[in-house]
């Protein structure tokens, strides 16, 4: 009897005390957090020797601040969500674990074909030189939302080019009471750096670009920047577009604006705001010189202060997150993109796409997706460009003054990056 008891105790100790713990900080709340918790639960059930503890920190700002504070105090999780510019900043402290040795491990690694199955833009966003520091997680692309009922009633086709967008915006804008202020706007945009960057990329320009020495240089003082700023000024001066800093899904649902560009992550809000009022749809962003668009979203990084067994366990979970079935499950249940091409062949994705014809439309742009620069000062540079954009369209400064100041400020931050 004593021998049996000791055997049971040994089994229990292995079950409850022998599992390797992986602490995972994230910023996924609401239904997205519930989906993530289900993925974590499934992983833990299928990996009895590993326990992943998912810890919701709060929004992205809260997560970023906690990571920076944790880096200073030496109190970091095993893995965390992180934007590429966060990773770039943390790399300066040499606390982010390179993943190549885990990827190439004969027992727990992945093949070259499996890694190349991850969409190229997402792979590139996780790689510095030849070193992989992250795996992609919650990714979204920009798409054009439109009021299908209104466009159909007006006999307007969905714009496929910038010129068609201008034509449609003008044709759809209505001043019903003739007071000089439109009651319905054909197009709307947010006065954010994201809006400016989307159109700058479509025009073929960049905020920064790589120089001959492999370092980023300012590219904001360009003809493309001037054309994009002029484009938005024309929209506002012609009163065929509505602009505000906040999200546009509510006024879209009210029928006040009929087209706008935002990420696919906003779909649920559009569905809620427009339900029972009109039919909506989405389409790839219009072509200007290109259809290149930035993608949004975070990756998962591992910290080097973890124990070796924790790192290997963490890699198992990271590998699980980007497996075709799991990334497809994540995408179908959250509205984000699957990160691997083979995920589109999974049963869960095929069934979802069959019942939801909108699901695969954003993927028409996946090969045109462009990543943000991997700069630790990218947030600061974005703030500079946001100021330039807002000051100009609000008439605070003329175009040349706005651009020259932005160029000067961006160059200062790039000096800081490479000092």
What feature does the model see in each segment?
Residues 20-29, 50-55, 79, 317:
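Short, well-ordered beta-strand elements
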Residues 29-51, 385, 403:
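Short, polar/charged alpha-helical segment
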Residues 38, 42-118, 149-160, 258-259, ...:
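Extracytoplasmic "Venus flytrap"/periplasmic binding protein-like
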Residues 84-141, 166, 199-201, 275, ...:
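Hinge/lid segment of periplasmic solute-binding proteins
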Residues 116-117, 280-283, 332-387, 391, ...:
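Long, aromatic- and glycine/proline-rich binding clefts that accommodate carbohydrate-like moieties
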Residues 124-137, 142, 166-216, 257:
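Extracytoplasmic/periplasmic solute-binding protein
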Residues 145-148, 296-309:
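A bilobed periplasmic-binding-protein/Venus flytrap-type ligand-binding module shared by bacterial periplasmic
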Residues 168-170, 213-243:
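Glycine-centered hinge/linker elements that transmit conformational signals in sensory
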């Amino acid at each position: 009897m004593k021998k049996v008891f000791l055997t049971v105790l040994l089994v229990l100790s292995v079950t409850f005390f022998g599992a390797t713990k992986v602490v995972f900080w994230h910023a996924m709340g609401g239904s997205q957090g519930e989906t993530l918790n289900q993925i974590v639960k499934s992983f833990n059930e299928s990996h009895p020797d590993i326990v992943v503890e998912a810890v919701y920190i709060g929004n992205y700002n809260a997560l970023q601040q906690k990571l920076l504070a944790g880096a200073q105090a030496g109190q970091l999780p095993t893995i965390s969500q992180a934007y590429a510019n966060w990773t770039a900043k943390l790399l300066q402290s040499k606390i982010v674990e390179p993943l190549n040795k885990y990827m190439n491990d004969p027992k727990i690694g992945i093949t070259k074909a499996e890694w190349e199955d991850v969409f190229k833009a997402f792979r590139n966003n996780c790689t510095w030189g030849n070193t992989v520091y992250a795996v992609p997680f919650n990714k979204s692309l920009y798409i054009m939302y439109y009021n299908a009922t209104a466009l159909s009633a007006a006999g307007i086709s969905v714009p496929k080019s910038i010129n068609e967008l201008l034509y449609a915006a003008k044709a759809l804008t209505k001043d019903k009471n003739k007071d000089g202020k439109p009651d319905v706007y054909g197009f709307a945009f947010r006065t954010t750096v994201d809006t400016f960057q989307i159109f700058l990329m479509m025009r073929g320009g960049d905020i920064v670009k790589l120089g001959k020495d492999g370092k980023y240089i300012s590219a904001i003082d360009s003809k493309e920047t001037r054309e994009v700023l002029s484009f938005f000024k024309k929209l506002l001066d012609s009163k065929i577009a509505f602009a505000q800093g906040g999200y546009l899904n509510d006024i879209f649902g009210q029928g006040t604006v009929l087209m706008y560009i935002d990420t696919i992550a906003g779909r649920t809000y559009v569905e809620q705001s427009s339900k029972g009022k009109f039919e909506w749809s989405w389409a790839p962003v219009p072509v200007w010189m290109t259809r290149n668009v930035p993608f949004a979203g975070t990756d998962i990084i591992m910290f080097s202060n973890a124990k070796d067994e924790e790192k290997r366990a963490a890699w198992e979970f990271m590998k699980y997150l980007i497996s075709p079935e799991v990334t497809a499950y994540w995408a179908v249940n959250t509205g984000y993109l699957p990160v691997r091409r083979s995920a589109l062949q999974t049963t869960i994705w095929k069934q979802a796409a069959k019942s939801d014809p909108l699901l695969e439309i954003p993927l028409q742009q996946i090969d045109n997706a462009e990543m943000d620069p991997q700069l630790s000062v990218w947030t600061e540079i974005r703030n500079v460009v946001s100021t330039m954009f807002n000051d100009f369209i609000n008439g605070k400064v003329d175009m040349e003054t706005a651009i020259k100041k932005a160029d000067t400020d961006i160059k200062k931050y790039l000096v800081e990056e490479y000092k």
